[in-house]
């Protein structure tokens, strides 16, 4: 059976709403980023799907109902097709999905992404924000390969990001 985990997709898309709070955190981390370092990092808090088809992501974005606490976000995820992602952090669901036309790719919780760009845009004459991401599978693979201690605690800035996004217990110092 062909493996569902892959590395041959170049660009993936997602249309969804996000909270103003999360959007403002992304802007903050992007503005504080140090060039050359993966500093504006966000993690998936739960399972997360993207699609290989931009039009499908736009359709989902158009279906989103928002209120004063949310904005519409159109994510463009760059996958480096030259990397062997052997951590199995994502799967191509198209061949096993009940809805294969959606061309879904599933990312597992704690998949890491670097925020590359945030900008205002319009889809179907409706305001939204484009959020360009880079998948950090290579970064995670290197962390995993270099890990010497199972209980490694990230540096303070990285730890603060994890805390702020609710991905690290507040009791960890």
Each model region followed by its residue ranges:
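Mono-ADP-ribosyltransferase
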Residues: 1-173
